[in-house]
Amino acid sequence: MVFLGVTMAAGLLVGRGPVPKVMAVADMEGYETLKVFTEVLSLVQKNYVEDVKTKEIVYGAIRGMLNTLDPHSAFMKPEQYKEMQVETKGEFGGIGIQIGIKDAMLTVIAPLEGTPADKAGIRAGDKVVKVDGKSTKDMTLTEAVEKMRGPKGTQVTLTILRDEFAAPKDFTITRDIIKIQSVRHKDLGDGVGYIRITQFQERTSEDLAKAIAKMKEAKVTALVLDLRNNPGGLLNQAVEAADFFLPPKKLVVYIKGRRGDKDEFFTREEETFQGIPIVVLVNEGSASASEIVAGALQDWGRAVVMGTQTFGKGSVQTVLPLTDGSGIRLTTAKYYTPKGRSIQNTGIAPDILVDAEGREPEIAAPVDRPREKDLDRHLPNDQAADKEPAIKDLKKDQPAKKTEPRRPGDSPRDDPQLKRAVDLLKSWRVFRNLPPTSQANPPPATP
């Protein structure tokens, strides 16, 4: 199993073929290091002032080992590993927020819509300084997620630091069963359909097929595919989603590991929406698997990508089970769009740059929201600077906006970005129906 999503309280996975076997350490340096580890473990067991639990010490060492790597590699205790497997089905107990580490602080990337955290007023960019009174300083993402999760009806208190607060403020949130509805759809009228994918779970492609069937029943002639605030998910589901919008045998994405091995993923089925114009909406919260879909449609010229620069997570995590029921999530590869672009740290640059208020770059200002490049220990982009996609962050010379980013709405009336997308599709249809210049009647002469 492979991850293609931002580390978060909800948990996101990506699947890819069989899990590789864990190889034994084969070099002398590795053996010598293990000898030092066992020596320290023995000294602690024999000489520490109080009795110690060996398993907890070993787990702590493994956790520390993975914490020296990138921000998406992590250790999972047996109970965490089991819960991770449940998460891919889209249902778990918790408060519903995406979190990451920014500037050595636990930071909210985004609350999931309609969840307890969202209803309590938690915002993207909030700094979580305490969980149930315990400082988050030096707390790993795995530990933070574990503390925030729990049975329905129980409470957790997050101490939040926000620019507008004079001092940190406590938010007491009642946990609930978080059921992630990964696909939503709506007929916007005038032949324009709307499909939103909130994340890529086990059943996303099935739900997407149902949504597309509804759109075809409505006889839509243009489509908005909304991937805003989609933090990623299962790789196979991202590929299957792209399958609906591209012809067969088209490359969707390829991934490469340290040894240069390359896996390619192609579309298989006939395109469902052949010939109709598509606008893909993205923003700073669009990460990983959602960036794969947006990048594939952009590279093949199948859709216009509109919105703001995406998150920029271009790495792949493999989930490796351990013998005692625990597991590790290890970054094993990077992924590339069909044209060979790595979006690690850079993200997908939209074709049409429009901020959450519907404004274009001349008058827009950036939203202060963490991206991959802001996370501690993030991996570099391995492409030469002259080959990297242009980073079109809005108004770099202006201070970032401290207000909460606007949430996607289901209607163009309360969602300026969606309104811009709908307007573009309508104008597209008008221009497409114009007769060729040679056939058009000239304007009447003015006497």
Tell me what each language-model feature is.
Residues 18-33, 37-54, 85, 107-111, ...:
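Cleft-lining beta-strand/loop regions that shape enzyme active-site pockets
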Residues 322-333:
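Short acidic, Pro/Gly- and aromatic-enriched capping/linker segments at domain boundaries
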Residues 334, 339-447:
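Conserved functional hotspot residues or short segments at active or partner-binding sites
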Residues 1-14:
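Hydrophobic membrane-insertion alpha-helices, especially the h-region
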